[in-house]
C-alpha cells in the first residue's frame, strides 16, 4: 500500500477540526449531564418542588450556553495566535503497511503501533498517537477518490475503527 495525501493546514482546517471536536465534546458530556439533570428535575416536579425543578433546568441551559460560548472564545483566541492562519502549511502523508510518513518542513515516520485512535469527521480523518499528537488527513488531499475508501478500509482492518464512508 502506498496512499498519498496532501493536507493543507490552514484556517479552514482549524475551524473544521474545532467544530468536529466541539460536537463530539457536546455529545459525550452534555448528553450525560442532561439525562441526569432531567431525572432530578422530573423527581422534583413529582415532589411538586417546581421552583427547584425550574432552577435546575435553568442551570442546565446556562451551562449549555456557557459551554458553546467558551468554545467560540477558545477558537477565536487560537486563531489569533496560530501561525497557520497567515502562513498555511502543506503536510504530506504517505500511508504504508506498517507506518505512515509525515512530511512538512521535516519528515517523520509514525508506526501504526503508536496509533491510539482513528476517527472520521465529515471531511477528514483524525489520527491520534500515544505521544498525544493529532494528525488531520483532509479528504480533499487525496488525488484519487478511491484512496480515501482504501485508507478507511485499511483503518477498519488495522484498528477495528468501524469507519463508514
Positions of the model-derived regions?
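N-terminal membrane-targeting/pre-transmembrane regions
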Residues: 1-40
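Hydrophobic alpha-helical transmembrane segments
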Residues: 39-62
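Conserved beta-hairpin
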Residues: 68-109
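Generic beta-strand structural signal
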Residues: 94-95, 119-120, 129
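Phosphoinositide-dependent membrane-docking surfaces
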Residues: 100-101, 108-125
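A membrane-cytosol interface segment of integral membrane proteins
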Residues: 126-165
Amino acid at each position: 500500500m502506498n496512499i498519498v495525501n496532501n493536507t493543507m493546514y490552514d484556517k479552514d482546517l482549524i475551524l473544521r477540526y474545532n467544530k468536529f471536536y466541539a460536537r463530539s465534546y457536546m455529545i459525550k458530556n452534555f448528553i450525560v449531564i442532561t439525562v441526569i439533570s432531567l431525572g432530578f428535575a422530573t423527581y422534583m416536579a413529582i415532589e411538586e418542588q417546581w421552583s427547584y425543578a425550574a432552577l435546575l433546568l435553568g442551570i442546565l441551559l446556562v451551562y449549555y450556553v456557557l459551554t458553546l460560548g467558551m468554545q467560540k472564545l477558545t477558537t477565536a483566541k487560537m486563531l489569533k495566535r496560530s501561525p497557520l492562519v497567515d502562513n498555511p502549511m502543506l503536510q504530506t502523508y504517505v500511508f504504508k503497511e506498517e507506518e505512515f510518513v509525515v512530511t512538512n518542513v521535516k519528515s517523520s515516520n509514525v508506526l501504526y503501533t503508536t496509533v491510539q485512535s482513528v476517527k472520521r469527521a465529515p471531511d477528514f480523518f483524525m489520527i491520534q498517537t500515544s505521544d498525544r499528537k493529532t494528525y488531520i488527513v483532509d479528504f480533499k488531499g487525496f488525488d484519487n477518490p478511491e484512496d480515501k475508501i482504501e485508507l478507511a478500509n485499511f483503518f477498519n482492518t488495522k484498528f477495528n475503527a468501524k469507519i463508514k464512508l
